[in-house]
């Protein structure tokens, strides 16, 4: 019996690999001779680097870069086991969690550190880049990233404009002749699960600006500035992606990656499953087990369990979902490939207890699931 174990992380308690290991222990206590394949995965958000490194026996590389407020921060990226695919979470360099609440101001926060991480990945020999762009603190349209990679964004005096979305109003010309030439030979895939355009009422600023510290007065300024950046890019490069779905992701970083780096924007879970070669592994599987911290009505919108389940169903492989908590409105997942759901929490326990004993609860739940399968095989002579 071949069993694939492909969970996402359980936030604040288990990494995807730790969750997979606990599930394996539980199943092995009932089916010790089964063929187990652990594939810790993610949906392109937090934990994607760790999951892909763990799944491919890769490594984490630390790098000091420019933080959102211009200060040095210790960030990281992953190099997958093939030695040529780098995985970057832009939040590691330019994330909202790096900015104290009282200092959040997208007029001044920058994506420069994200560009520096990309440069470091190229220095490490990357030929393919996977970039997750969730959790940003920025609304600069990716200007800082472009500057870090050698592009020049100039004001009327020929000087580089400053950091942040506020400085974009000073932009008078764009020079990409110095953009890192290695980028021309790199395949760049961006994990993007939002469909917002760059500007307008559904754009980067209007939808995501407030959570990054933008006041009502800032919103119009930022939207106008990012729109100006797009106008200038269209004049300089002859192309525009401002209305492309996902252009507004990460304060316009999605647009910049499309416009300047010719990136492909895809659903995060699709990129991750392709990176771990999930399709070839699942074809002859007997069972797939997936899961994440919470399964609810939002799980069907591009989350890991549904991505895994849909891939498995292409080959008629049954799928079991395991979660820390399961909401009352989670039934939609049954129409998207998951056959059964189980919660690991043994009754009404304090949240702290659930986090602290998550591995124990996971292993026990997995053992009980395996025992139920064995019992069914015995009773119904399957």
UniProtKB/Swiss-Prot annotation:
Name the lineage: Bacteria, Bacillati, Bacillota, Bacilli, Bacillales
Pfam families from the xrefs?
Answer: Gly_kinase (PF02595)
Under the heading Gene3D superfamilies, the entry gives: Glycerate kinase, domain 1, Glycerate kinase, domain 2
Q: Sorted alphabetically, which keywords does the UniProt record give?
A: ATP-binding, Kinase, Nucleotide-binding, Transferase
The record's top EC class is transferase
- This chain belongs to which protein, by name? Glycerate kinase
- State the organism of origin: Bacillus subtilis (strain 168)
One GO process term, biological-process aspect? organic acid phosphorylation
Q: Which InterPro entries match?
A: Glyc_kinase_flavodox-like_fold, Glycerate_kinase, Glycerate_kinase_RE-like, Glycerate_kinase_sf
GO MF annotation terms: ATP binding; glycerate 2-kinase activity; glycerate kinase activity
Q: What is the reaction catalyzed? A: (R)-glycerate + ATP = (2R)-3-phosphoglycerate + ADP + H(+)
Q: What is its EC number?
A: 2.7.1.31
* Family per record: Belongs to the glycerate kinase type-1 family.
